[in-house]
């Protein structure tokens, strides 16, 4: 059984107040993301994917899909995400809504 068979998934919807807020977060992530991703990986983050939402009137929305080895791995990553919120999101106005669950079905061409 591979790690992706039964991961814990978090889907986060991010809505920014302005293009400037989105740009600020993107710049901060570009600068700081690699160090955080290494720590998240060690704690059980398997992957993440960012997608801009294009079927809405606003261009200020995106979703992020995070896959973790388990619910425990997700919990172990939470202190790191708290740091990320304080550094990467600092100075930006952003509304974050998260949905979490256990994968019931997964398909990939890989």
Task: Annotate each language-model stretch with its function.
Residues 1, 15, 22, 30, ...:
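Mature, folded catalytic cores of secreted/periplasmic enzymes
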Residues 1-8, 41-63, 85-110:
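Glycine-rich beta-strand-turn "strand-cap" elements at beta-sheet edges
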Residues 13-15, 65-67:
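Short hydrophobic/aromatic beta-strand micro-patches
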Residues 19, 67-73:
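Helix N-cap motif at beta-to-alpha junctions
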Residues 20-48, 81-92:
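Short amphipathic alpha-helical segments
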Residues 77-78:
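Short, solvent-exposed loop/turn and secondary-structure capping segments
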């Amino acid at each position: 059984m591979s790690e992706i068979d039964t991961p814990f998934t978090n889907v986060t919807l991010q809505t920014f107040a302005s293009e400037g807020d989105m740009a600020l977060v993107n710049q901060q992530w570009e600068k700081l993301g690699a160090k955080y991703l290494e720590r998240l990986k060690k704690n059980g983050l398997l992957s993440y994917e960012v997608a801009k939402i294009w079927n809405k009137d606003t261009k200020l929305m995106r979703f992020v899909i995070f896959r973790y080895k388990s619910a425990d791995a997700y919990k172990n990553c939470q202190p790191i995400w708290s740091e990320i919120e304080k550094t990467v999101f600092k100075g930006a106005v952003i509304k974050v809504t998260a949905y979490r669950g256990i994968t019931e079905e997964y398909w990939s061409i890989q």
